[in-house]
């Protein structure tokens, strides 16, 4: 089974439910709302999902990775459906997939660009940990030594690569201290 084929997912479309960043700036007087798709795996799966900064420590199906508030009603200016994936940006998010027993560990260093991708990647590996260095205040080097990933991925908006590191604030994306 290929976990990443479209037919493996139930797709729910929220019609005219979303304004992106540019749409919010232009307002509904100038742009039309967009459709937004919410995908759920059709295959058996069970995930242990943890976001320490939000007090989330849950076991369940893929739906636990979605923030129900963001999908509860239309609010073009106060809600952002992309924040519905993975409860938006958090310093650390951990996944343990109980259906995959391969002993593999992936560490993802990310910005908000990866929020939509990460839950789906968690379906194909036993352990996945996500760090957003813009919010993470610990030592990434120490964290990596303790987590011992098999691979480290950096998933970020291309504009993140252009920004200089602010060594004073400890909030720059590439501040890997």
Where are these regions (language model features)?
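Extracellular glycan-modifying ectodomains
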Residues: 1-177
């Amino acid at each position: 089974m290929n976990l990443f084929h479209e037919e493996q997912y139930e797709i729910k479309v929220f019609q005219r439910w979303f304004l992106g960043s540019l749409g919010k700036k232009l307002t509904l007087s100038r742009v039309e709302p967009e459709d937004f798709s919410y995908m759920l795996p059709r295959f058996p799966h069970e995930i242990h999902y943890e976001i320490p900064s939000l007090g989330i420590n849950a076991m369940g199906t893929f739906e636990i990775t979605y923030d129900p508030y963001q999908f509860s009603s239309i609010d073009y200016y106060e809600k952002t459906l992309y924040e519905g994936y993975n409860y938006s940006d958090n310093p650390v998010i951990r996944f343990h997939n109980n259906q995959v027993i391969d002993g593999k560990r992936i560490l993802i260093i990310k910005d908000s660009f990866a929020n939509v991708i990460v839950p789906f990647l968690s379906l194909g590996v036993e352990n996945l940990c996500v760090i957003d260095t813009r919010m993470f205040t610990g030592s990434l080097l120490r964290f990596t030594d303790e987590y011992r990933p098999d691979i480290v991925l950096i998933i970020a908006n291309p504009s993140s690569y252009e920004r200089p590191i602010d060594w004073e604030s400890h909030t720059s994306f590439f501040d890997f201290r």
